[in-house]
Amino acid sequence: MKHIINSYENINNTARNNSDCPRVVLPEEIFFTISIVGVLENLIVLLAVFKNKNLQAPMYFFICSLAISDMLGSLYKILENILIILRNMGYLKPRGSFETTADDIIDSLFVLSLLGSIFSLSVIAADRYITIFHALRYHSIVTMRRTVVVLTVIWTFCTGTGITMVIFSHHVPTVITFTSLFPLMLVFILCLYVHMFLLARSHTRKISTLPRANMKGAITLTILLGVFIFCWAPFVLHVLLMTFCPSNPYCACYMSLFQVNGMLIMCNAVIDPFIYAFRSPELRDAFKKMIFCSRYW
């Protein structure tokens, strides 16, 4: 969130002067290239699901929700780069009303990306839980109508919360709320995993009779979750350090890696579609047909 970063900019500069860690600066071209690839890859995921009737199931709709979150994160960086280019060329007045409004909109996309990813992964975890332990009732519990309602509620909440967080981004409670959502999501999914493990021990025979695809979906979720944590945790930690120890040289040393942490977030959007393709033969076939312009709908 740019507003949060800017509010601590002077303090961080002072802290860096007391630190031996130089600030790591990455070329904007790297961010721009990764972001473009992320948008294109996730756009292919969305088109594959909506053009292929065989993929129009609740699980794939939840994956589309995660793909939209990833795409918003990539789009955020693209628009930010365009804004910087226009400002450097003199087309925008620095700190002007238009740039401030544009910054707010772009920052909303970033927050929306994180919130969307958190809730999409959570609902995918719940879906996998139902698939494994309520397999016979799955289609009566997870209907398309309920899926649409759940996703509508999630994105309505994320949009409202994202806009609110950007408006009040200078306030510490907003930062705490922003960063607390990350561990809360992990706790929720961890509770599901623990419960799944305990039930699996008492229902070993029942679990062994489940279709392999059900268990494969749970493994896919684990991979997606691991990648999400790896890519987003450094940035969340950065925001926490910037809030609670901005002048500390050790905190400043970690914060010197801000652009590296930002690049990891962009990489998340690029990695996820490869996970879908690697773990799902249906999506992999759909991707191949789309890339080679085959007619399959």
Curated annotation (Swiss-Prot):
Annotated Pfam families: 7tm_1
GO biological process: adenylate cyclase-activating G protein-coupled receptor signaling pathway; G protein-coupled receptor signaling pathway; G protein-coupled receptor signaling pathway, coupled to cyclic nucleotide second messenger; regulation of metabolic process
Gene3D superfamilies registered for this protein in UniProt: Rhodopsin 7-helix transmembrane proteins
Membrane-side (Cytoplasmic) residue stretches: 50-58, 127-147, 200-217, 279-297
Main localization category: membrane
This protein's GO CC annotations: cytoplasm; plasma membrane
Name of the protein in question: Adrenocorticotropic hormone receptor
Organism this protein belongs to: Homo sapiens
Lineage: Eukaryota, Metazoa, Chordata, Craniata, Vertebrata
